[in-house]
Amino acid sequence: MDNRFSNIFNLTEDQAIALFKQPLDIEDGTSERYVGAAHLINFPTERSIKALIEAVEDRDPALANRIARRKAVESLGRLKATQALPTLKNCLGDTDPLTVENAVWAIGEIGTEDESLLQAITNLLTQPHQTYRVIIQTLANFNYLPALKKIASFTNHDDKSVASAAISSVARLNDDYSHMPAVAEFLQSDDINVRRACIQDLIDAEYYPAIASMAKAPISVAFRLRGIRLLAAKGLASEKITFATIEPHLDRIIRDRPQDIDLVHEYDQPPSLDFLIRELYHTDFGRCYLAGKTLLEIYPQEAPEALLSTYQEEAHNDYGAHFHVVKLFGLLGYQPSQDLIVEALHNTSPQFQKSRAAAAISLGNLQSQPAIPLLKQTLDTPIFDLKYACLLALEQLGEDCWSEVINDRNLLIKAKAAYKLDPQTA
């Protein structure tokens, strides 16, 4: 789990516990309790775990306390606090569904062989208003076969993210993957949450036939890249797939051209330029990709100025739109954007990380020879997608740097380098 923001306030253990135990009736008590609960994950001590358990056992019905309890439950899971399992088991009967959800997840993180605990989780599948997806995933991760029949009853659930988890879990528990194509089809769902969710289910089932569809799914590059990286790691280790199988799809994700995406949306009439620019700010990346593709097709002459204008006004501070704008400048071949793209390449703010890889690809698309030294310097980065993008861009600029990363610590960069130097190795 990404812990970059876990201790952004630099709290000590004493300070975190003090915040966590603030009375509910003081000013800002709500947020302070929550912050304290969140920050105790930085201190895997008996004292912190005891404080978190005490917080979970405090059943004051006030909203502030309920919110803090949920976070305390989550923190116990992240700390893998086995001594908290009895307390977490009691949470399975809580009237707050979000507390129940967090308790199930936390038990999954901690691990258990307690049959009564696993059965208690299974029984939640018969109760209304529960987060069935998390329950199903947790039971499958425990390989708990007694839950199979109950899980199977959710394979046609109205909530397709639940159905996806159920189909994937049944496949894993039964060792029968004949119905997994249905999960891959969810990559084309109208619901962005279903598209995102099924990526995890394809990973959990180690369903390699979905790699090509995953690479073209209309969701954020971060979801697709995570999916293919985890599947590749498992598949290469088990020798169920080769790097040659993965390479074109991995390259497609890193290049992330909207014309390579299998879109789920369409326009009933040609949209205006202003409308397409606004669509780049949408949280559903499927709509962003459709807008980008349409900009390239209908407004190749007008788009650069419009993109530059929206960048200066708003996109420079919106990490989603920033990513699309940086990428589109390269695809449009807009040479005046080079300084802006170089700035994006060097932007180390975590929320703009995707834009750094997009910037590298754009510099390659712009055939920017002056960028070659900058791209080579950036090869020192530990960030996978940025390094991979720099290597692709350098290759596009006539610079073969694969021999320099043949011993890279990242599995896929090392495999790519070996494949480029000797295709027979894959």
Region locations from a protein language model:
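Amphipathic alpha-helical scaffolding segments comprising HEAT/armadillo-like alpha-solenoid repeats
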Residues: 10-24, 43-60, 81-93, 112-125, ...
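Short inter-helical turns and helix N-cap capping residues of alpha-solenoid HEAT/ARM repeat scaffolds
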Residues: 27-29, 60-65, 95-97, 127-131, ...
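Non-membrane alpha-helical segments in proteins
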Residues: 31-42, 67-75, 102-105, 290-293, ...
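Residue-level detector of extended alpha-helical repeat arrays and alpha-solenoid scaffolds
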Residues: 32-33, 65-69, 100, 132, ...
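Conserved hydrophobic register position within alpha-solenoid helical repeats
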Residues: 36, 72, 103, 135, ...
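Non-catalytic interaction/regulatory modules that flank or connect domains
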Residues: 200, 229-230, 274-313, 317, ...
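Alpha-helical adaptor scaffolds
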Residues: 319-361, 373
